[in-house]
Amino acid sequence: MKNNSITILGAGLIGSLMAIYLKRQGLDVHIYDKRPDKRKTPYYEGGRSINMALSHRGWKSLEQVGLKDKVLPLAIPMYGRKIHDEHGGTTFIPYGKANQAIYSISRGKFNQLLVEEAEHLGATVHFEHKCLDVDFQDNEVTFETPTGEIRLNPNVVIGADGAYSALRMSMQKQVRVNYKQEFIPHGYKELTIPATAAGEFAMDPHALHI
């Protein structure tokens, strides 16, 4: 690898956006992700996903890398929460002043756009590369790939590999690291609400429904 080579673990939203920032600085960037390339996987095989909401901080980051105008067409403004009670009634609670909104966006489509932008800028994305261990003493990262294990010696490693981070687990084994993990008691249910006969949203698209 080059002397300015950066290795990012995780090709999710954070990892791919970080790659875009670094490529714009002229650095050599490699992203490794344990999952297959979602662009080659039909949506129904890709697992469930909750739409995410973009607020001011998210838009500011996208603006800094020149992606705001590309992402905006994928997003729907939400001006508040719509609370549904057990009797079928609803109450609308605005997020702020008139026209102040956060934006709902498909996590999958957003992630795909960021990965493609990172690749367009010259980052290399290695899918199906599961990080098994990071050896800080020997500056070595071990990956499991479809063809077997490989070991690399990157100059810099950035962890963006989520809740069960392999990088964090490796750090815990080798240095004194405190962290806290909490689980909430709530469950998760995915509902599909088809459009009306006229092809319109069956529920107000400009609100977060609770």
Go through each PLM region and give its residues.
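N-terminal Rossmann-like FAD-binding beta1-loop-alpha1 element of flavoenzymes
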Residues: 4-31
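Glycine-rich FAD pyrophosphate-binding loop
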Residues: 23-47
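Short phosphate-binding/catalytic loops that engage adenosine nucleotides
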Residues: 27, 67, 123
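Rossmann-fold NAD(P)-dependent oxidoreductase module
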Residues: 21, 113, 117, 170
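Active-site-adjacent segment of FAD-dependent monooxygenases/related oxidoreductases
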Residues: 43-113, 117
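A conserved beta-strand/loop element that lines the FAD pocket in flavoprotein oxidoreductases
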Residues: 119-131
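Conserved Rossmann-like nucleotide-cofactor binding loop
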Residues: 14, 37, 164
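Conserved FAD-binding catalytic core of PHBH/FMO-like flavoproteins
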Residues: 132-133, 138-210
